[in-house]
Regions:
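Thiol-/selenol-based redox modules, centered on thioredoxin-like
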Residues: 149-208
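Short active-site neighborhood of thiol/selenol oxidoreductases, capturing the structured segment around
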Residues: 58-87
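Sec-dependent signal peptide recognition
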Residues: 2-8
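N-terminal "domain-start" segment that seeds a small globular fold
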Residues: 22-63, 85-86
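Hydrophobic h-region of N-terminal signal peptides that target proteins for export
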Residues: 9-18
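Short loop/turn microsegments at loop-to-beta-strand junctions
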Residues: 44-45, 67, 152-154
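Structural microenvironment flanking redox-active thiols in thiol-disulfide oxidoreductases
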Residues: 82-138
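Structural micro-motif
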Residues: 122-125, 136, 140-156
Length: 208
């Protein structure tokens, strides 16, 4: 029943974006969601993280996925806990649709920071920074791209080709807006394009 209600709600909300081509998704979301900030940068800062057991997770290895990246530094407490709870709600909306196979949520935390939110591990990765870096340092590297204050935790949305698409600040944003933004990215013009075969001129110039 809950699954059906979420799907119905998303279908009702979707027309708000239906008349907007993919290249306008940032403009539309800026109008609808005060917590949203456009990034539109070709790449993200470096991030070296390990999964439980010591396996290295590379964001580049998820190039075919939309990534929702968040940070839970030590002593972040309530602000981060609230954001994690909202993000699990977004995951729930995503996972009742085919988007589940196209979206990965990544939470970076310090080893002694607790994550109380109930995530679906099917498309959620919990990681810690590599090389003795702190989560706060990694979060600051990402937040440096923002033109807003850094008091609130940020959820970074990374497009399938590694483009740093946008940031959702804090925990007061609409879960449905983030879900619709993810859906828009899945369908928009920023998706990776298949390689094209070289023509004779490209083949000739390639010799030099």
């Amino acid at each position: 029943m809950k699954r059906s209600l979420i799907l119905a709600f998303l279908l009702i909300a979707q027309p708000a974006f239906a008349n907007h081509p993919g290249e306008r998704i940032d403009e539309v979301m800026t109008e609808q969601e005060p917590a949203f900030e456009v990034m539109d940068r070709p790449s993200t800062p470096d991030l070296d993280v390990d999964e439980p057991g010591g396996n290295v997770l590379r964001l580049g290895g998820l190039h075919d996925q939309i990534i929702v990246l968040s940070f839970v530094p030590q002593n972040c407490d309530s602000p981060c806990a609230k954001q994690q709870a909202v993000l699990t709600g977004v995951q729930e909306q995503v996972n009742v649709s085919p988007m589940k196979e196209m979206v990965t949520f990544v939470t970076v935390h310090d080893a002694d920071a607790s994550i109380k939110a109930t995530w679906d591990e099917a498309n959620w990765r919990l990681v810690i920074p590599s090389n003795d870096e702190t989560t706060a340092a990694a979060a600051n590297r990402f937040s440096a791209s923002s033109d807003r204050g850094q008091e609130l935790p940020m959820a970074h949305v990374i497009d399938r080709n590694g483009r740093h698409a946008g940031i959702f600040h804090g925990s007061d944003f609409s879960k449905t807006n983030l879900t619709l933004y993810i859906n828009g990215l899945i369908n928009n013009a920023h998706a990776p394009k298949p390689p094209t075969e070289k023509g004779w001129w490209g083949w000739l110039t390639g010799l030099f």
